[in-house]
Amino acid sequence: MDGREAMAFPGSHSQYYLQRGAFTNLAPSQVASGLHAPPPHTGLRPMSNPNIHHPQANNPGPPFSDFGHTIHMGVVSSASDADVQPPPPPPPPEEPMVKRKRGRPRKYGEPMVSNKSRDSSPMSDPNEPKRARGRPPGTGRKQRLANLGEWMNTSAGLAFAPHVISIGAGEDIAAKVLSFSQQRPRALCIMSGTGTISSVTLCKPGSTDRHLTYEGPFEIISFGGSYLVNEEGGSRSRTGGLSVSLSRPDGSIIAGGVDMLIAANLVQVVACSFVYGARAKTHNNNNKTIRQEKEPNEEDNNSEMETTPGSAAEPAASAGQQTPQNFSSQGIRGWPGSGSGSGRSLDICRNPLTDFDLTRG
């Protein structure tokens, strides 16, 4: 038929005549319209897999089922060859795995030090003096006080000890605190006091009547003072005094130096005692003297203990020698059934440390 053949498509009633061999580069839309295929576009490429067939070729229509040509469908690529990205670079080579050592790891391993740091580290000088162990000299309490001056070194106290003094109702608080400070040759500092006062006698230095007495009750607001040891007046001589601030029920306050302070109920006074000045030096010297006196006594006691065991060992040895002579044949007998009981008793008396031989009859 002049190089053309008729082809019918499903769903249509008209017949189309197409030239033979025109289906190799036709798109499906062009085949359906019956138009001749235009020249192939540069962006169109034939399908690389020849096994894929158009569904219309596998399903022949009823009028013309022996159509002998195969229609190859190609995939249209919108990207050009220039837009193809290059393949990714190969991954870097993996580092060789370090073989793990067998066994239990060390608890305190040596730090890893590079060769460069070892070479750069300076060598220790053998002539350099070694650092002494312990606290360096000049860091003690006396050295720190010496930096502040001689007056600070001589005025610093030692052996600080806190105290709580309890005064019952009706007792004089000032007299009780003074008697407490006279018990030992130590300075006493009053920190505070709490309680109720029934009456107080204050010293007013500017008035003609130096003693003013007030009747309470009063509440103690503040209570303080100090008693220092008088070096020239004896061990019981003290210098110093007490001061108090009291509050009345109406809110008024009276204060001044204390001459007499009577407690209305239990009053507690917090104080501290310490050694200072020349007493501190004497205290240290006395401690050294006591230690020196104790050391010879301990040496004498040790020498007596060394001589005592030797002298005690001699009577013990003599007693050990006399003990076998007190044994008699009547007190020690042989085993029952043996005919030589008296002979064994004599052997035991001669040598009391001899073991018994159970194999003998």
Swiss-Prot record:
Function text: Transcription factor that specifically binds AT-rich DNA sequences related to the nuclear matrix attachment regions (MARs).
Gene3D superfamilies: Hypothetical protein, similar to alpha- acetolactate decarboxylase, domain 2
DNA-binding span(s): 99-111, 130-142
Protein name (record): AT-hook motif nuclear-localized protein 12
Keyword entries, A-Z: DNA-binding, Nucleus, Repeat, Transcription, Transcription regulation
PROSITE patterns per UniProt: PPC
Polar residues compositional bias, start-end: 48-59
UniProt feature coiled coil, ranges: none
Organism name: Arabidopsis thaliana (Mouse-ear cress)
Pfam families: PCC
GO molecular function: minor groove of adenine-thymine-rich DNA binding
Subcellular location as annotated: Nucleus
Main location class: nucleus
Domain notes from UniProt: The PPC domain mediates interactions between AHL proteins.
Gene of this entry: AHL12
Subunit structure: Homodimer. Interacts with AHL27, AHL29 and ATAF2/NAC081.
Biased composition (Low complexity): 306-322
Annotated Pro residues bias: 85-95
Annotated stretches, region: Disordered: 29-143, 286-361
InterPro entries named among the record's database cross-references: AHL (IPR039605), AT_hook_DNA-bd_motif (IPR017956), PPC_dom (IPR005175)
Motif (Bipartite nuclear localization signal): 99-107
